[in-house]
Regions:
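Short coil/turn linker and secondary-structure boundary residues
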Residues: 10-13, 22, 38, 56, ...
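Cysteine-centric redox/oxidoreductase cores and disulfide-bonded domains
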Residues: 19, 24-90
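Single conserved hydrophobic/aromatic residue that forms the stacking wall/gate
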Residues: 1-5, 9
Length: 177
């Protein structure tokens, strides 16, 4: 039988749909928020200008973006653009928020929460949540205005050393809190 959950997975947003249907401002917001790209508006504008012709492949998208890519640093900007698309398709920020919010309800008192994040946006969210019990920069407060801390920090930030990165290159951006 078909369940509501499996229907959600059948009809998943694709990067192709994002590139070809999101408004210029929605694309710019996405690229700025998830890719932390300062020239997000310029990139979004360029994508929208090429819309009469559908952008169906990564090669086509790379070609469209070529004129805004800094010489010698193309791969870094492209990585941030594709990261933004992946994060939107997979709803990664929503999933992380949901996970963190549920964690305080399922952890035993005195239990430990360890989270590995792979880029600064995720790490900032995790750090704020552990520090403040919410995703704002201000701590959650009880009825008397006292900070309500759900987590006690134990141990510091852990990042991979050179040897680990040599063995597993994808670990280079990982941060354990």
């Amino acid at each position: 039988g078909s369940s509501a959950a499996s229907d959600v997975y059948k009809r998943q947003l694709t990067a192709k749909e994002i590139v070809n249907t999101y408004s210029e401002s929605a694309l710019a917001d996405l690229l700025f928020a998830y890719g932390e790209l300062r020239n997000a508006k310029k990139i979004a504008s360029l994508i929208v200008q090429h819309r009469p012709d559908e952008i169906a492949t990564t090669m086509q998208l790379n070609e469209v973006l070529r004129q805004v890519l800094p010489k010698g640093n193309e791969h870094k900007v492209l990585a941030k653009i594709y990261q933004s698309l992946r994060m939107e398709v997979n709803k990664e920020i929503d999933v992380l928020q949901s996970f963190l919010t549920q964690s305080k309800d399922v952890l035993k008192s005195g239990g430990r929460l360890s989270v590995i994040s792979y880029h600064s946006l995720e790490d900032r969210m995790v750090k704020r949540y552990i520090q403040n019990g919410n995703f704002d920069s201000e701590p959650a407060k009880d009825d008397f205005g006292n900070p309500t801390l759900y987590f006690k920090k134990c141990g510091g930030l852990v990042v991979p050393d050179k040897e680990e990165i040599k063995q597993n290159n994808s670990a280079r951006s990982a941060t354990l809190r």
